Amino acid sequence: MYVPEHFAMKDEDAIVKIIQSYPLGVLVTQTESGLDANHIPFELDRERSVLAAHVARANPVWEQCQQGAEVLVIFRGSESYISPNWYPTKHETHRLVPTWNYEVVHVHGRLTVQDHDKFVRGVVARLTRVHEAGEPRPWKMGDSAPAFIDGMLKAIVGIEVVITRIEAKAKLSQNRELRDRQSAAEMLHKRGQADMANAMQAFEKTIARGDKQ
């Protein structure tokens, strides 16, 4: 991925936050017929540097890839169109053009298949706990009949991606003046695009902390 230095995201906590906030990753694999991409919700095990997930047994991805095959998982964070009209300097110089701001994390690693009940049951339970946490009465696997759950688990296969390296990019108008960035963030808030607005404002706080050190 092309990452200019001023757009490089190096803060590990910020990278983890994107993966956890936008867990639907794109698993890119190389097959005999070419590149393949599958959209899968992942769980990050930060201590082990591993991504865990499951796929349908009918999905050929787990059979097409050899154990330890090199793969790429892409996580897209907040993103938004940015109009030059939002920048005060545009109205002074008329030398700005539209752009697109975004956050993205590329996780490189090696794929291993975990086709056994303990792994599959564990990853399903953990993903469920995380994503049901905001519900008034969170659903849990024990809410369904054991035989039904057993049948569902047999229809999926577990996978892990052992992380080898991570590239992360946050294009948040860092190449613009402070007043331009602040104005763009305000316009995004007005348009209900809080995720990108908050990301840009969080970047400003990071700069402020750095200036005080």
Predicted regions: what they are:
Residues M1-Q213:
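Binding-site signature for planar aromatic cofactors or substrates
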